[in-house]
Amino acid sequence: MSKRPVALIILDGFALREETYGNAVAQANKPNFDRYWNEYPHATLKACGEAVGLPEGQMGNSEVGHLNIGAGRIVYQSLTRVNIAIREGEFDRNETFLAAMNHVKQHGTSLHLFGLLSDGGVHSHIHHLYALLRLAAKEGVKRVYIHGFLDGRDVGPQTAPQYIKELQEKIKEYGVGEIATLSGRYYSMDRDKRWERVEKAYRAMVYGEGPTYRDPLECIEDSYKNGIYDEFVLPSVIVREDGSPVATIQDNDAIIFYNFRPDRAIQISNTFTNEDFREFDRGPKHPKNLFFVCLTHFSETVKGYVAFKPTNLDNTIGEVLSQHGLRQLRIAETEKYPHVTFFMSGGREEKFPGEDRILINSPKVATYDLKPEMSAYEVTEALLKEIAADKYDAIILNYANPDMVGHSGMLEPTIKAVEAVDECLGKVVDAILEKGGIAIITADHGNADEVLTPEGKPQTAHTTNPVPVIVTKHGIELRKDGILGDLAPTMLDLLGLPQPKEMTGKTLIVK
């Protein structure tokens, strides 16, 4: 029996904007996309900011886009989850934070807050530190010490003074907190097993060892004089008038590590939490009975308490298709294969029953502007065979070109990339229509729509422009206010399947 597949076709990095200058999507000759756009119900979707679980105004990316598409709901990223918790008052009721504060009140000990001291939003956000200071003041914790990791990478290389001054203002405002140590992230946030770096940060915090300064700003000035900028500032100790450290981490203290991204938080956390730690000698004063809090789940190896536990994504599109006994195919070239598999399945590696995957190798070139078609033709050829074989009820396909070539910031190759994808799109959609199937043509975020700045310089980053959605079915109407999280419910609707309660997105088809 002939299958009538519903195919979700993701044109990676393909968004829409009216301005045609520097816009490879608008300038490309794409007769197939234009034909489907004119002939079938279409709309645009928001693919950035809070619509995909990021802070407002922040551009989307492929990982976040595919997570939202597959989950059929807004998947809040860690930064946004914490921001919302602060905004709605949940942060102050967080049981893990309150337990850490009760621990130090019961033992008459100190609370240490450490993390990256910037608003870069990649590993941490300084506003989360301020929220912790405010909470400590509210909870009556008297001894609160800050161990600031200096950034200079996700923000400018000499921005530490502005963050330190801002922090000092907040300390005055809340009446709690003192800066105890400062360390460039090169030391305290190493992830490459350079344990000699981590040891320097550890010994500053626990033993008060390292260069000493009366004033945190003096530490930065001194480093700058020696040509050492924020990221590389040596772990340094702030001292009182008598030369003793403002604070060291001791037995029965509590630590709240307010970074939310795990990769650069794991080593320093292991140093404090692992009883069988062997990477360097922690010495006789290694603190015992520490109450160690990670803002998010860092790793199974970190023996600490987690303030914001991971959210499990149940009933993603793949799981629902599988539960209903449908056959599904995921297909992409190497660059976007993890996105149509792992991210589309909510961070799950294993296939669901009835799920097949086809990986087509991306071309071995230094940069994709040298081969703008990438492996789109090979992906298409493989998929056409599968459509002809009548095996699948649902297909999820990604074309990587507009994004990967768009990252070059070169207009001509990106136009060629869009044109190659359009040629392939025509073949795939026509094959699906011949089988009586339906295609949902969309994208995960923008990129190729803006590859030059207004001044004509390369613009290599993603954009915040809306992405298209076309459903190749006559006689329906699409909502105009959709988000990526509405695509899975739409797919289920077209397949005649019920939408699980976990999917809080809504079908784009107007009822």
Curated annotation (Swiss-Prot):
Biological function: Catalyzes the interconversion of 2-phosphoglycerate and 3-phosphoglycerate.
Binding site for Mn(2+) 2: 12, 62, 444-445
The EC number(s) this enzyme carries: 5.4.2.12
Keywords, ordered alphabetically: Glycolysis, Isomerase, Manganese, Metal-binding, Phosphoprotein
Protein name in UniProt: 2,3-bisphosphoglycerate-independent phosphoglycerate mutase
Family: Belongs to the BPG-independent phosphoglycerate mutase family.
Keyword S-adenosyl-L-methionine: no
UniProt source species: Geobacillus thermodenitrificans (strain NG80-2)
Top-level enzyme category: isomerase
